[in-house]
Every structure is written in C-alpha cells, then in structure tokens.
Amino acid sequence: NLPLTKQDNGQAVPCWTISNNQIIIVIMDIERILKTRENAIYYGIGEYQKDCFGWVGGNAPACFDDKYLSDKDNLYFYLTFQNPLNPNKQISIFTPDFDIALEYNTYPDCKLLLVEHELSSQSKSDRYKHPEIDEIYSIYEMSTEKDMPEKNCAIKFGGNVMPIQWGLDNDGKVVKDGNSFIFQINEICMKDISVFMAGCIYVYGKIEGNKVTNPFVAYWEYS
C-alpha cells in the first residue's frame, strides 16, 4: 500500500507526523490528482546527481543486488523515482529483452515489471544494467499543474491518461477490470534513451480510499 504523505518546505513528511488539517490538504491533493484528475505531478530529467533517489539508465538501486527478479526472462533496469504518495518508497521499472517486451506489450500480459521498495541509492553492481542504455539522468519533480504539455515531461503522475496509439483503447481494457490510471512514462522526452521506440509506459492500480494498491505496468505503446 502507498500511504499518504505531505510535502513541507520541500521535505517529505509521513502523514503520521502532521496535523489533521495538513492531512486534509494532502487528501485534497490526492483527490485532484487521482480522482477528479484536475491536476498531475510532472517530472523531468537532467544531469545525473549522485545520492538521488530518481534516475533513468545506469545501475539498479542497491537493494536489488541480492534479489533474483525472474525465473524465465532476463530483466534489465529502466528507471526509478520516489513515490510522490510516499516519499519513503521508490518505484522501479524493469524490462525484459526487447523482442519479449514487444510481443507482450498489452494488458493483461505485459512483461514489464514494477517494484515498489525502500529508498535505495544506485548500486555499484551492473547486474541489472540495460545493455542499450549508455546514458544516465536524474529524475526530478517539475511542477503540479493542470494540463501541462505531456511532451515536456518524462513522467506524468495522475491526471488523465494520454495514449499515443489512438484507436487501441488500451486504457478501456484495463479500467474495465476495476483498475485506475496512476502514471505514465514518456520516453520521447528522454534524450538519448529509446528502449521503447520513443513510446510510453502506462501504470495502473487500485485506488482504495486515499491509497493506491497493487500498482503494475499494464501496457506500453510506441510512436
């Protein structure tokens, strides 16, 4: 589960340390981002900064050094970033070899893996490094706005889903099973990175009260 948190002067504060009034403000923010979807949180990428908790490319977070993620497919690290609903957690995305990712790119068979985990800096081990990603960039939060152009952001958290392959109705197939759109990754905004053919990765989950449960990569599309 992803518990609520409050951003206070740029610092993440778990909701159990803040006042009732502040918790109400957080709930209102979640309401606008994931329920009424008036707003979204937008992320960009920039020069890699050591000791950050959000990056694309490079090595996986160190917490995966002793983890075996799949019995069947090779899995490679793609990106990680702090969960804005719980900045004490990170969300990491892994992908199999491209031919497998392409064959299984739709719901409910998508092979991309999402793992939520404790905060962890980049590993020194290249065990999960993606062989086709040479660059590494930090991921940072840009703004929380309404209708910011998706072409300008690497990740859009909340708001409305923005497909790039119109007519497939991938969103409708996932929503029909009771899932809700949580965030999307826009690879076209990532300089020098094109693992998914400048495509988009779409993450869904269950919204229960003011929490998101069981987030997963539902599908990805390419331009």
Question: Model features per residue range: what roles?
Answer:
Residues 7-11:
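Short Gly/Ser/Thr- and charged-rich N-terminal loops/segments
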